[in-house]
Curated annotation (Swiss-Prot):
The gene is zapE. ATP binds at residues 78-85. Disruption phenotype: Mutants have no growth defect in aerobic conditions. However, inactivation leads to a stress-dependent elongated phenotype (in anaerobiosis or at temperatures over 37 degrees Celsius). It is found in: Cytoplasm. This is Cell division protein ZapE. Its main location: cytoplasm. Disulfide bonds: none annotated. The lineage of its organism: Bacteria, Pseudomonadati, Pseudomonadota, Gammaproteobacteria, Enterobacterales. Reduces the stability of FtsZ polymers in the presence of ATP. Required for cell division under low-oxygen conditions. Hydrolyzes ATP but not GTP. Pfam families: AFG1_ATPase. The keyword Flavoprotein does not apply. The keyword Hydrolase applies. ZapE abundance has to be tightly regulated to allow cell division. Loss or overexpression of ZapE alters Z-ring stability and leads to bacterial filamentation.
Amino acid sequence: MQSVTPTSQYLKALNEGSHQPDDVQKEAVSRLEIIYQELINSTPPAPRTSGLMARVGKLWGKREDTKHTPVRGLYMWGGVGRGKTWLMDLFYQSLPGERKQRLHFHRFMLRVHEELTALQGQTDPLEIIADRFKAETDVLCFDEFFVSDITDAMLLGGLMKALFARGITLVATSNIPPDELYRNGLQRARFLPAIDAIKQHCDVMNVDAGVDYRLRTLTQAHLWLSPLHDETRAQMDKLWLALAGGKRENSPTLEINHRPLATMGVENQTLAVSFTTLCVDARSQHDYIALSRLFHTVMLFDVPVMTRLMESEARRFIALVDEFYERHVKLVVSAEVPLYEIYQGDRLKFEFQRCLSRLQEMQSEEYLKREHLAG
């Protein structure tokens, strides 16, 4: 049976017509293929201890000396819509076995903070966390590597070095090059070791020369789809496939401001979610701010006509649109009626006129070209 590789998956996508030939993507696939082959052909070092002695060592908190040079990884950076996440996923899906992890960088840092809380009072907690990751994986794939929080910045210098020292290979995507991470941040000097570690253990590739596939998809599509019938649902599914790079198979529950938020899909910094979840349930403007930072594209499903009995829902919808607009979030909507018929209430006519104007602008090519403001 022929093995699945990044190259074979890339060629399959071209043959099926789901992606077009792109020289920059082809170069990235070539680099990912090299990493893949080196990982497949490398033999991890044998553990120093096993059985009873290993369990006793762990019980007493002793760590093995597992330092070795990892297979050199890849840090792909560039604007949205360049296919970075799709390329990384080709690589990740090609890797056999379970000793691999693919995480949104925000989720990775949430786990690190949870582990640190549990390890309060321990000496060298970052070393322990690195040990735990090494016990689970040999490859980390980070989507959207971005640092804006001073606490994260202070941790990453030591943590990245510890992960690389244990032979973990990193493949990451980001909107900015390593040298621009945490630019102008407080005490940035303490973050510089993280940048040095990334550049020492990863090739850095700019993918900006390629086609902006997300922009092309959005500019060629209707972004306000109505009415709510089978054809609209099929169009939304087709757009999700193009924007997120896969079918809506996972519907994780997010934690936003310490409260659960049910989704219809999360992938490639794209969120699928219902109007009920965001505007009927009691969500606050702070929730919309958090979502606008996390996702560059939101697909909002099943927006009803907002009558005078839905003024609270309409007010939340206005707040949601305002936050998405300010951070250049791309919004795709399925609705009961066309855009200018969606509000039929009384009290918010003035406010909704401004909202409609923004929604109209958010469908323009000029708006769609704007860079998402995640920070």
